Amino acid sequence: MKRCVIVGAGELKASSIPVEKEDFVIAADGGYAYCKRLGIVPDLILGDFDSVKEEDAEQIAQISRICPDSVVILPAEKDDTDMLAAIRMGLSEGCRDFRIYAAQGGRLEHTIANLQCLIYLKECGAAGCLVDETSTVFIIRDETVWFREDAAGYLSLFSMGEKAEGVTIRNMKYELDGAEVTNSYPIGISNEFIGKRASVTVKKGTLAAILSHKD
């Protein structure tokens, strides 16, 4: 499955991002500065560049002159966020597995919008996650997700609609059996792995899953 790595303009403290030669790498707006700092050469630079420093803007303009197909300049006023536009480009390149970095922190509304982008990926038959130094965020929708026996940390589940039905959690500290998880009661917060092959099943609905790493 072809993978897309997107670097956004949120917070990024990591000293490296795992990128394979076959990955399609997109720098979304201010994510270009992170790519430059980490020595990553993106296949595509995309955005309205409202969060880009002048020095980086000049470099992007120079790249655009040399290789026009590697830079997409978006209008400042548009329906799609820069991140959603980057995801659409990744999908058009045939990618179905997305790793999205620097998509959290900063302005809260952008973090929430990026979470919604994960739902969009599910609707397109793809999968993705938001990754930072402390957590990985992904979507569970009408499916069962399995975790390895050596999984560690905390797993929190939140309904992304009015309710998620038939939620079953197995082999974790707190289990559920065919429960209804609503968006007004945080029953899925801070579950823990116990050294067994755990699973989460959602019969109908969408859950946001946050896997938080232990210190």
How would you name each of these model-derived features?
Residues 135, 140-215:
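Long, charged alpha-helical interface segments
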Residues 97-146:
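Anionic-ligand-binding alpha/beta catalytic cores of soluble enzymes and soluble regulatory domains
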Residues 7, 26-28, 47, 72-73, ...:
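General beta-strand structural signal in soluble alpha/beta enzymes
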Residues 62, 69-92:
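Short phosphate-binding loop-to-helix
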Residues 36, 91-94:
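Non-catalytic positions within long, well-ordered alpha-helices that form the structural scaffold/packing
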Residues 30-37, 86-87, 114-118:
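Histidine-anchored nucleotide/phosphate-binding helix
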Residues 1-59:
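N-terminal beta-strand-loop-alpha-helix module at the start
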Residues 14, 80-84, 107-112:
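Short glycine/serine/threonine-rich phosphate/pyrophosphate-binding segments
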